[in-house]
């Protein structure tokens, strides 16, 4: 895509200083979609490979196009996002963010990942010269507004919500210095979610991240309510045998004692399932499936 971001687009960037580190940081930036007025279709860029998905009409069950776009963005991005960052002064203060989070909370579970890996939310405000408030009181006000908008528990979709006020703009303070605290907060939040993913064995390599993201894109285009199942997606090219249950029952019928069950049957079944989930060519098959 061009450097100019059209309304409704989300552009993916890599944080340049982290590009060749062991901890590369990806940033997806965009505006809050407002698609109630039809716009012309985007023109494909010649320098980028483009692919499209036709939405199933059942995915557009919300009253407006904007709400439908919100639904799609959240269900697609949430399983792959560490932190959602909103700049309150750019979108009209707290109310638009409250409405958006309330909509997201009402959408239900976006994926089968553990709750501890859910993304965090950071709301950024700008201090004026006469700033007299504090982040804690502003956060309480925000959470009160959110509780009035929805009865859903925030922890259903997000692992935390925080608020950060940036220093007032001054001639002797560079933009880099103003935003240093923001970057530190984002990195700290991301590290916390990353640790949760490590602890639950759901931190994926870049190759698998890309493959799962493409699978999630097709899933979101095809269904409106079912959460994206990472395990099912990983088995697309190696589906579970339909008669697996029968084989397990027959095998266990031959186990006559608790000792045989613990010392023989359970280890054999466990190792067989693990080996079946990781055939020699599964990585290549998953990448080929994504390309197709």
Question: Where are the model-predicted features located?
Answer:
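Conserved GTPase G-domain substructure that encodes guanine base recognition and part of the catalytic core
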Residues: 1-292
